[in-house]
């Protein structure tokens, strides 16, 4: 009796597997691409909503600094970074985040470097404490006027007023570690 029951289970399992394989073979590449596109769209939609919440939390903190607003901004960063992290499975697919040429890059501007550039030279943004225990200088925050981030072919940028344009111009200006915008820069600050 146990052998017969085991045999039935094995046959049922085999039939289920063959049926699933047959269904998989019938699935067209269009259906697979549509599913992929829907997953990507859902992930990017969630990322945009979370990034918008992060922007609101940062604005609240900047306009009315408090421990509560700081905690809310940190929590919003964690949520936003997590949802953006899920979109990284779509990297290197020539999509709206990292396309470097063609109509997609023209339409979306390939913002991946502005969002997620790494590694980060923290000293470019604000002071750090060096190995001698002294505060460093020569960063965006303590510079009035033109700031040159250093590196290869770096261009000085006016940081008298820190604007979106100034930060975008500084980002990766002179080298990959010259990161002035995105999740890692916000995390440092």
Each PLM stretch: what is its role?
Residues 25-189:
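Mature extracytoplasmic or organellar-lumen-exposed domains after removal of signal/transit peptides
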Residues 13-16:
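Short, linear, compositionally biased motifs with a strong N-terminal bias
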Residues 1-11:
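Bacterial N-terminal signal peptides that target proteins for export
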Residues 19-21:
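N-terminal signal peptide c-region/cleavage motif recognized by signal peptidases
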């Amino acid at each position: 009796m146990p052998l017969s029951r085991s045999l039935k289970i094995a046959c049922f399992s085999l039939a289920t597997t063959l049926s699933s394989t047959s269904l998989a073979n019938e699935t067209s590449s269009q259906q697979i691409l549509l599913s992929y596109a829907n997953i990507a769209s859902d992930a990017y939609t969630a990322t945009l909503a979370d990034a918008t919440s992060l922007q609101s939390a940062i604005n609240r903190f900047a306009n009315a600094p408090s421990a509560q607003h700081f905690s809310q901004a940190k929590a919003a960063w964690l949520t936003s970074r997590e949802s953006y992290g899920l979109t990284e499975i779509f990297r290197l697919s020539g999509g709206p985040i990292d396309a470097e040429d063609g109509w997609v890059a023209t339409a979306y501007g390939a913002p991946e470097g502005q969002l997620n550039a790494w590694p980060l030279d923290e000293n470019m943004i604000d002071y750090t404490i060096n190995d001698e225990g002294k505060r460093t200088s020569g960063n965006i925050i303590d510079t009035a006027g033109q700031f040159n981030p250093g590196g290869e072919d770096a261009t000085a940028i006016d940081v008298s007023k820190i604007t979106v344009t100034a930060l975008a111009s500084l980002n990766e200006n002179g080298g990959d570690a010259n990161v002035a915008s995105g999740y890692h820069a916000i995390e440092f600050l």
